[in-house]
């Protein structure tokens, strides 16, 4: 299953500038997904991280992985229109190399477990086939806030 940006926006509450996934490829509900983030110089975080040497903050790479995991969790859980996935934990995070403008992040998420509404994922981020970051991520569903 492939999800384009409008499909992703139906599953996740994130919007610009914090929606960090452009497309999800090879989504297998209850198992795994591969997300794509095209990193451009127009990203707002590059203004301050770092001027003259733009590097995508590691925490945003983790967030991009979490968003792919959130989409997998949403598809796996089924009818959750009144709820949204919340990122609840990070374990074993490692950053292997910087990510910058022009890079295409490939975000590979594997669902390790899903019990009592807690989803645990193994996430890895690659650029050109090279591992740039990895982490274990956790998420739960909670009611969508009433605006």
Swiss-Prot record:
Transmembrane segments: none annotated. GO terms for cellular component: cytoplasm; membrane. Gene3D superfamilies: Hotdog Thioesterase. Keywords: Cytoplasm, Lipid A biosynthesis, Lipid biosynthesis, Lipid metabolism, Lyase. Pfam families: FabA. It comes from the Bacteria. It catalyses: a (3R)-hydroxyacyl-[ACP] = a (2E)-enoyl-[ACP] + H2O. It is an enzyme of class 4 (lyase). The active site is at 49. Involved in unsaturated fatty acids biosynthesis. Catalyzes the dehydration of short chain beta-hydroxyacyl-ACPs and long chain saturated and unsaturated beta-hydroxyacyl-ACPs. Belongs to the thioester dehydratase family. FabZ subfamily. HAMAP family: FabZ. This is 3-hydroxyacyl-[acyl-carrier-protein] dehydratase FabZ. It comes from Syntrophotalea carbinolica (strain DSM 2380 / NBRC 103641 / GraBd1) (Pelobacter carbinolicus).
């Amino acid at each position: 299953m492939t999800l384009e940006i409008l499909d992703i926006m139906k599953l996740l509450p994130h919007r610009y500038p914090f929606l960090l996934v452009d497309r999800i490829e090879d989504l297998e509900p209850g198992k795994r997904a591969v997300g794509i983030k095209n990193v451009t110089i127009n990203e707002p975080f590059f203004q301050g991280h770092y001027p003259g040497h733009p590097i995508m903050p590691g925490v945003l790479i983790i967030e991009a992985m979490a968003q792919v995991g959130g989409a997998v969790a949403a598809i796996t859980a089924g009818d959750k229109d009144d709820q949204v996935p919340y990122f609840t934990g990070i374990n074993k995070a490692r950053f292997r190399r910087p990510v910058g403008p022009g890079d295409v992040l490939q975000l590979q998420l594997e669902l390790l477990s899903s019990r009592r509404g807690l989803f645990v994922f193994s996430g890895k981020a690659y650029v050109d086939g090279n591992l740039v970051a990895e982490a274990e991520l956790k998420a739960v569903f909670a009611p969508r806030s009433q605006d």
